[in-house]
Amino acid sequence: MTLLVLTGCSGSSTSDSATTASESVQSQEDTFVEVDPNRLEIQGHRGARGLVPENSMPGFVLALREGADVLEMDMCISSDGQIIISHEPWMNGQICLDPNNAPISENQAKTWNLHNMTAEEIAEFDCGSVALPDFPDQQNLPTYKPTLDQVVELAETVPLLDGAQVRYNLEIKHSAELEPEFCPDATTFAKLVLDKVSALGIADRVCIQSFSAAALEAVHQIDPNMTTSWLVGTEGTVQSQLDKLTFTPDIYSPQWKLIDAKDVAQLQGQDIRVIPWTANTKEDLFALIEMGVNGIITDRPDLLYKMR
């Protein structure tokens, strides 16, 4: 497989990016095929982490070109109020180098707090050149943590293999433990995200997910029509997990080992879609397909596309 290498939209302002993306959506919205709601949905986890660096511009482009229907990504907030695409609200030394291309130790990582840095400062860190033993097929390349504006501006120009329009699964990285040092409060975070997806013109193609009940509650209170996904990473019955919310989410998204066919049937019987994370081998992907899940979040959208 030949991997596409892109540096992304470095240098463009976020306001210009938002305007460009919104105009692109409006000019193209009548040219896409309708999505089949019964077809297995392929979500590229952090782009295509098994092939290129996570949450990166090259990763999101590759995910779409390898068959993803949905780009799954993580959101943090910078000091200047920008939505930064990053799994941690700090510079993880396992994937990032500092602006001098020096390694970042575990003790140093949280001193590089994204919530205390501007988007411009964050972009000075290389978060793609470090090799990851867990992903031997990943092509390492210099890249940075982009803003949501930049990702959408680029993704809207990439044709999907089935001719449909790209969709987005956006995770709010909020918790009581992170707040307020590493993230804003749940309501502020939710409003920033909802305002941004509205400005970008993609609200009808967005799902907002979180492990934080407070974050999802805030999203639902501000915009009851926004699609929501409840991320589950702990053991417990399906109902006990759902009871942690005061409303019914559109999607139940458990760690893939925490779900079985009976759970899938129960949830779908309640009109809740089931989209587990993060399965990567053919055997695990096949097992989930056999359960009848609605979609799968995977680091290898290329493998899942061939199995669909």
Predicted segments with their positions:
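Sec-dependent N-terminal signal peptides
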Residues: 1-2
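Phosphate-group recognition and catalysis centered on beta-loop-alpha active-site segments
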Residues: 9-308
